[in-house]
């Protein structure tokens, strides 16, 4: 019984226990209120269109009556008072449509029964031919900016996976009826260019989005198809300024009503956007976006005109898919540069790569972070000439392009990353110092200016370029991969990405700060590792905003220790990989698998053993200076853990200490300390290893990796 009680979750601090940080509940408007708001917006647009149609009909009818009176008067004068019936045969006529026509652009369920009756009566009154009005789009009918709103996206719109069956791109489960050929709609001519026979990236539309009554037949139309959106926009332009867009077919007004088949609940929960060339309305109450912002943009960029929201506008060129998405050669898996739990990286050309994300939210977060970093770094520091136009700002890699259809982002290409870099020499210690100073500056900039925490500082996420004449020298380094990044709590409900491709706005998820989802298990800062071991449900201990930056720099210190072990161990890199690093990553995979399967207790047990390997790393590199780290960690484990977990911890620590001996690095450490750059890196590692409990996160981040 005592063992079970001792294994319960407790605070990682040796002092008085305190409750973990519990974020306040999210205050989001109810689902019904969001639907009501979108319904009101659509009704306002419909009423504006009907008023425009009625005004045009009245004007044309009056002109028609006046002309008939003139013709009758001339007939009376010519025929001695005999009235003849005349018809206007030389006047081109156009039928002005009311509610029924406009319902092809908005949801039919937003109209009440009374409004439908009014629409039918208006259509009956306007059945005779009339002359169209010449009023412009800037008239009173469309001056509110809601003329011709179209529902552009639903939660079921985007779904992606790779096509392993054939070489030809196909959109599966898309049903076309009414004479349409699925093959023509999938692999045809898009944007005036013929699509290649082997596009490597495939978009799978799992759920039909909307049905249109076309000639009495239900035709399933893919709203995410570029051709259909272009056809709808071209038809609206061809109808002339000030006119109501015509249906896609030649059917009557009653046959043009739109019925949305997607789940309205998930639609309103995620995003529901109506847009045209003047305004983008969103399901976020009080937020409207200006699509004209895209005209001056070439990369994602933050628009700080709004105080309430951080809007990042994401442009897309018309031929982006032909130049990027269809140009990636994925025929051979050996071409793949990297693969992880969040996506794959493939080469595009000599200077660029594309990242194909597994989740759509991954792409949204990446481009939002890219726009935020690019804009905030613009006025901070001038870019080096070699990095201008590459998407690298303040040591942070950003996306230079995005395609939601294929879930692709474009990035600058680097030679390798720190994990795969295998040329480490003491003669190039000055380049290593510059690289880690750049990374520390990037972390401080990301936390202080952008107010975002990266939460995934690992050697795999540090990209480097090396000197081709001296592969041991690191020329530049950049931090990448914002898959786990979260904004500070004061940015909750404020981060939005607006996409030109779909005319939609996406909200960035609020911060959750679950420690089990933050950082790679092998590089997680020791204070957070202890909190997670005690409580798998623990969240980040937010007692002050400076804790975020201190935690990030502590993780960077773990990366520095990882690199120093490769640099200083006299046995060589191969022995380090098979021995030291194998022990560090031995239980990291088990922790990740347990987390995926929801076995949080097993994840906590694996992190306890990883803590033993982290402690062994510090003791090996620091020697006698690491005695305080070892004694404090052992006291923590004995005080907080059960006897069986203590025995497992001691057993694995003994195994690690037999492999990570200080004698293997002692001579190279002396050579390292003989240089100013080596002394700087060694002291930086010592300071980061001194952050061993929750209270240490309240320190001054300027003391870590000082300038």
Swiss-Prot record:
Keywords: ATP-binding, Host-virus interaction, Kinase, Modulation of host cell cycle by virus, Nucleotide-binding, Transferase, Virion. Disulfide bonds: none annotated. Autophosphorylates on serine and threonine residues. Pfam families: UL97. Residues 113-127 have a biased composition (Basic and acidic residues). Residues 1-33, 113-146, 176-198, 231-264 are annotated as: Disordered. InterPro entries: Herpes_UL97, Kinase-like_dom_sf, Tyr_kinase_AS. Changing residue 592 to G: In GCV resistant isolate. It catalyses: L-seryl-[protein] + ATP = O-phospho-L-seryl-[protein] + ADP + H(+); L-threonyl-[protein] + ATP = O-phospho-L-threonyl-[protein] + ADP + H(+). Its EC number is 2.7.11.1. Interacts with UL83. Monophosphorylates and thereby activates the antiviral nucleoside analog ganciclovir (GCV) used to treat CMV infections. Subsequent di- and triphosphorylation are carried out by cellular enzymes. The viral DNA polymerase incorporates GCV triphosphate into the viral genome, leading to marked attenuation of viral DNA replication and successful suppression of the infection, while the uninfected cell does not have this ability because it lacks the viral kinase. Mutations in phosphotransferase may induce CMV resistance to antiviral therapies in immunocompromised patients. This is Serine/threonine protein kinase UL97. It comes from Human cytomegalovirus (strain AD169) (HHV-5). The gene is UL97.
């Amino acid at each position: 019984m005592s063992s079970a009680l001792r294994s319960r979750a407790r605070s990682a601090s040796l002092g008085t226990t305190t409750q973990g940080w519990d974020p306040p509940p999210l205050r989001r408007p109810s689902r019904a209120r969001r639907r009501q708001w979108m319904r009101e917006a659509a009704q306002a647009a419909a009423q504006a269109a009907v008023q425009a149609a009625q005004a045009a009909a009245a004007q044309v009818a009056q002109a028609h009556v006046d002309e008939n009176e003139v013709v009758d008067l001339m007939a009376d004068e010519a025929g001695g008072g005999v009235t003849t019936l005349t018809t206007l045969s030389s006047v081109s006529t156009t039928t002005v449509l009311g509610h029924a026509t406009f319902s092809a652009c908005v949801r039919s369920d937003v109209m009440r029964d009374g409004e439908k009756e009014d629409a039918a009566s208006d259509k009956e009154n306007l059945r005779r031919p009339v002359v169209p009005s010449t009023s412009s789009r800037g008239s009173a009918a469309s001056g509110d900016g809601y003329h011709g709103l179209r529902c552009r996206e639903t939660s079921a719109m985007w779904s992606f996976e790779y096509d392993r069956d054939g070489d030809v791109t196909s959109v599966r489960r898309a049903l076309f009826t009414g004479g349409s050929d699925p093959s023509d709609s999938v692999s045809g001519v898009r944007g005036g260019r013929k699509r290649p026979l082997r596009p490597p990236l495939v978009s799978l539309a799992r759920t039909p989005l909307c049905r249109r009554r076309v000639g009495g037949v239900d035709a399933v139309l893919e709203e995410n198809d570029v051709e259909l959106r272009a056809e709808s926009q071209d038809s609206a332009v061809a109808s002339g300024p000030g006119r109501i867009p015509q249906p896609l077919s030649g059917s009557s007004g009653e046959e043009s009503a739109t019925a949305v088949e997607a789940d309205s609940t998930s639609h309103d929960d995620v995003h529901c956007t109506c847009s045209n060339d003047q305004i983008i309305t969103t399901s976020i109450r009080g937020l409207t976006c200006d699509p004209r912002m895209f005209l001056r943009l070439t990369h994602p960029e933050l628009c700080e005109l709004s105080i309430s929201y951080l809007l990042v506008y994401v442009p897309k060129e018309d031929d982006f898919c032909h130049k990027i998405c269809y140009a990636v050669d994925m025929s051979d898996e050996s071409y793949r540069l990297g693969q992880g739990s969040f996506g794959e990286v493939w080469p595009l050309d000599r200077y660029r790569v594309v990242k194909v994300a597994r989740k759509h939210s991954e792409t949204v977060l990446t481009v939002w972070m890219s726009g935020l970093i690019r804009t905030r770094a613009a006025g901070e520091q001038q870019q080096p000439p070699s990095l201008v136009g590459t998407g690298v700002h303040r040591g942070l890699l950003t996306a230079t392009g995005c395609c939601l259809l294929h879930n692709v982002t474009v990035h600058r290409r680097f030679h390798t990353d720190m994990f795969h870099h295998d040329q480490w020499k003491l003669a190039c210690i000055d380049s290593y110092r510059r690289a880690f100073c750049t990374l520390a500056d990037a972390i401080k900039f990301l936390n202080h200016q952008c107010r975002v925490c990266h939460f995934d500082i690992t050697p795999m996420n540090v990209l480097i370029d090396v000197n081709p004449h001296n592969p041991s020298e690191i020329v530049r380094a950049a931090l990448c991969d914002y898959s786990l990044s979260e904004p500070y709590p004061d940015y909750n409900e404020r981060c939005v990405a607006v996409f030109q491709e779909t005319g939609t706005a996406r909200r960035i998820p609020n911060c959750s700060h679950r420690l089990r989802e933050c950082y790679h298990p092998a590089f997680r800062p020791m204070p957070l590792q202890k909190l997670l071991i005690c409580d798998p449900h623990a969240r980040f201990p937010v007692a002050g905003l400076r804790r975020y930056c201190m935690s990030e720099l502590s993780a960077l210190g773990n990366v520095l220790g990882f690199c120093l072990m490769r640099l200083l161990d006299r046995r060589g890199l191969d022995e380090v990989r098979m021995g030291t690093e194998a022990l560090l990553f031995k239980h990291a995979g088990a922790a990740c698998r347990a987390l995926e399967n929801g076995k949080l207790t097993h994840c906590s047990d694996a992190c306890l053993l990883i803590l033993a390997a982290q402690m062994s790393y510090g003791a090996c590199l620091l020697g006698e200076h690491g005695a305080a780290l070892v004694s404090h960690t052992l006291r923590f484990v004995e005080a907080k853990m059960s006897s069986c977990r203590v025995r497992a911890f001691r057993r694995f620590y003994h195994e690690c200490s037999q492999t990570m001996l200080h004698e293997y690095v002692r001579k190279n450490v002396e050579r390292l300390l003989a240089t100013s750059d080596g002394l700087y890196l060694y002291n930086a590692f010592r300071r980061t290893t001194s952050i061993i409990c929750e209270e240490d996160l309240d320190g001054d981040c300027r003391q870590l990796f000082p300038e």
